[in-house]
Amino acid sequence: MDSRVSILFVCAIAVSCFTSGSASSPVDFSVCNYEFELFRFDLEAKCPPSLYPTPPIEVDGDSLDRLMASQHGNAYMSVLFYASWCPFSRAVRPKFDMLSSMFPQIQHLAVEHSQALPSVFSRYGIHSLPSILMVNQTLNARYHGRKDLISLIEFYEEATGLQPVQYVAEGEPTGLNAGDGNLITWLRKGTSIREIFKQDPFLVLSLLFICLQMAILVFPIAESRMRALWASYVANLNLGRFGEISQLFNRGIHMVDVRRLWLKLSLVKTRNFHERAKNAQAWASSLASVSLGQTSSDQS
């Protein structure tokens, strides 16, 4: 009897332990799940899922103003102002796309010249294209420098203090379209001026405009220098020598009687003419006598 009671008591204790263990396990699981959720939320706050590379967003002037006004916090925004017809803008645009992949934590916007009013460009201090503007609540920095990828990365790092999440290699330019608007490179490749004018007429016209401006600036300076040089040269000449030379020339003319020489020449010519006439008459008479003698001999 006592043994049966003891066995039942042991079974009851085992069942109670099993039920208590099974009841406490969901509590422990819920506690672990709550801690994991806190860790996940903290991780997403520090590394948001929007870090995946996104291409720059094309916006117009009104959309840019709205995005600038709605910007809050320390979030950075990089804006590219460009013109589709400009070869330098076409060279910077792929680099700007690379920057959006290397710095996904920065929002990248692109504003084309024809999609915004001139007041928008003047409001943000844009006076040349292409231009890159880095903006947040306390920063409004416009990039001044070379447009190569390494210089742009250094500008991003200095302006924001952020490091690129990845490095993208810049592709080699191929063909005339990828020549980055470099006229020297095109000429080295043997590209004719006519082909360059067909591909980028604005580049050729801008070079002609620069040459005309240089000519307009240089010509007055060169003209004044030439006048000063001519004045100094004429002032140093001894005009008295020219007077002496002219006097000697006049004296020589007076010493030589030109009229007498002309008369002598005319007399010589007339004498030669008369002598030739006499010779011609003698020659004609001799021919006539010879012809008469021949006719008389024939008649006999």
UniProtKB/Swiss-Prot annotation:
Location of this chain's protein in the cell: Membrane
Transmembrane domains' residue ranges: 202-222
GO CC annotation, single: membrane
Gene3D superfamilies found in the cross-reference section: Glutaredoxin (3.40.30.10)
CDD domains per record: PDI_a_ERp44_like
Positions bearing carbohydrate: N136
Principal location class: membrane
Thioredoxin domain mapped to chain residues: 41-161
Membrane topology listed for this record: Single-pass membrane protein
Keyword terms of this UniProt record: Glycoprotein, Membrane, Signal, Transmembrane, Transmembrane helix
Signal peptide positions on this chain: 1-23
One Pfam family of this chain: Thioredoxin
Protein name, UniProt field: 5'-adenylylsulfate reductase-like 5
Organism: Arabidopsis thaliana
